Amino acid sequence: VADKLRNLFLLSPRSKGFFAALLLLAFAVSGHFLEHGWLGRGLYKFVMIFFPLAAGIELKRQFKIDRRGLIIAIASGIFLGAIAGTLIYFLLPHFANLSELKNGFDSRYHYTTCTVIIASLLIAGINSFLEEFFYRGFLDDRAGIPVSAFIFALQHVVVLWGLAGSLTVILAGLIVFPAGILWSLVRLRCGLISAWISHLLTDIFLLGIGLLLLGYI
């Protein structure tokens, strides 16, 4: 009887993936209603850490890369960063009021020139790894690459919502979706660390252009 009851609460790997994705989105949405700054808006990141570790994915196994994987990581990161960065540089001023967008970031996160640079470094380094660890390392194998990339894009839409017009935020999600597909393919071919390096380089491009456009640097 005890085994039967326990089995009722045991989810299949696919179900665990969807449950984790929904929980992550729920926490991301809740960040808009919690007045705890970075802590409240960053609760969904705990989901990114917990579920892969609970699934037995060991961090130390992810830090393996060969020369081929490094070359692919750097090439794909520069390629994607250059394309996405160019699109943002030329299109964002036409879809968003840059002054209002900057005021939105400052109001939500209380940025100064110093703190926004620190935040950008954390996003490029640590946040990009958490996203790769969760989406590519955990969710890809449980929900499939298209679903994983869709949730990845939707998470960015939820987090960015309210900072700019809805069309601008949705367009950002449309850019993020193919990036998620690409990093999944890099991970399948070369491993998770390669996907992370590619993601990190892309974020450096995008954050640098964003800081420039918004007048932080």
Question: Where are these predicted regions, by residue range?
Answer:
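Short, Lys/Arg-rich, polar N-terminal cytosolic tail immediately upstream
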Residues: 1-11
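Alpha-helical transmembrane segments in multi-pass membrane proteins
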Residues: 11-60, 105, 109
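Hydrophobic membrane-targeting alpha-helices
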Residues: 33, 55-58, 86-94, 153, ...
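Juxtamembrane helix-loop-helix connectors linking adjacent transmembrane helices
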Residues: 62-127, 216
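Transmembrane helix-loop-helix hairpins at the membrane interface
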Residues: 116-217
